[in-house]
C-alpha cells in the first residue's frame, strides 16, 4: 500500500540561507555595541572562577581585548587579533588568531592542561542586550553584555576593583567526612589552604 501526501515547507528559506542570515545578524550585533562588550569568561566550570574581559569588534574582523588587572602585566594594555563568526554547531564566535590575553586560558602548560579554557564559543542566544555563549570544547556557559553608554572600560574596571577592595576576604573551615579543609576567599578567588 502506498500513498502520496504533500509536504509543506516548515521554513520560508533553506537552512544555508537561514544560517547566513544568522551569521550576518551576529556580526552586526557584535560590531554594533557602541562601547564594546564585557565578556564574563569562565575557563573551566568550577576550578578558577570568572574573569572580566573587555572586547570591541570591528567590521573588518578585528577584535581588541583587554582585561581586569590580575590578568594583565600592564593594566590598560590592549591586544588586537582576528575573529570570525562561522557556521559550525550553529553560529560560532571563533578567536582564530592568537590573542595573548584571551588564549592564555586555552594554552596548555607543561602538564598539557593550562586553565582548560576555550577560544571558540557556540552562540546560544544573541541580541543587542546580551549574548549567551557555550564553550565549544568545555561546554561552560558564559555571557557577554554591552558596556553601558557613557561608561569606559577604565571606569567600569575601577568600580569593579573598588568592590573587590570592599571585600577583604575570609577563611572558613569545612569538615568533609572528618577531614577539615580551610578555604581562603580573597579578591574573588577561592584557594584551598593547609
Predicted regions and their residues:
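Conserved small/polar residues in nucleotide/adenosyl-binding loops
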Residues: 186-193
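Sec-dependent bacterial lipoprotein signal peptides
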Residues: 1-3
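A recognition module on extended beta-rich or small alphabeta surfaces enriched in W/G with H and D/E
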Residues: 111-127
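Conserved, compact domain cores that house catalytic/ligand-binding motifs in diverse enzymes
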Residues: 180-185
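An anionic, turn-rich surface loop/hairpin at beta-sheet edges
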Residues: 94-116
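Acidic/polar, low-complexity intrinsically disordered N-terminal segments immediately downstream
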Residues: 5-94, 100, 126-130, 136-143, ...
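Aromatic- and glycine-enriched pocket-lining scaffold segments that form the walls
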Residues: 176
Amino acid at each position: 500500500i502506498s500513498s502520496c501526501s504533500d509536504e509543506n515547507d516548515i521554513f520560508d528559506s533553506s537552512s544555508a540561507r537561514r544560517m547566513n542570515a544568522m551569521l550576518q545578524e551576529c556580526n552586526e550585533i557584535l560590531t554594533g555595541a557602541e562601547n564594546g562588550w564585557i565578556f564574563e569568561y569562565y575557563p573551566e566550570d568550577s576550578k578558577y572562577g570568572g574573569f572580566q574581559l573587555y572586547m570591541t569588534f570591528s567590521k573588518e574582523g578585528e577584535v581588541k581585548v583587554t582585561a581586569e588587572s590580575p590578568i594583565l602585566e600592564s593594566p590598560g594594555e590592549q591586544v588586537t587579533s582576528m575573529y570570525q563568526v562561522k557556521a559550525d554547531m550553529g553560529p560560532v564566535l571563533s578567536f582564530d588568531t592568537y590573542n595573548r590575553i584571551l588564549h592564555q586560558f586555552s594554552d596548555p602548560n607543561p602538564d598539557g592542561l593550562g586553565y582548560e579554557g576555550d577560544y571558540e564559543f557556540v552562540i546560544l542566544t544573541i541580541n543587542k542586550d546580551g549574548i549567551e555563549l557555550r564553550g565549544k570544547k568545555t561546554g561552560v556557559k558564559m555571557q557577554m553584555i554591552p558596556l553601558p553608554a557613557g561608561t569606559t572600560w577604565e571606569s567600569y574596571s575601577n568600580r569593579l576593583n573598588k568592590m573587590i577592595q570592599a571585600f577583604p576576604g575570609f577563611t572558613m573551615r569545612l569538615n568533609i567526612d572528618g577531614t577539615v579543609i580551610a578555604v581562603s576567599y580573597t579578591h574573588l578567588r577561592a584557594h584551598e589552604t593547609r
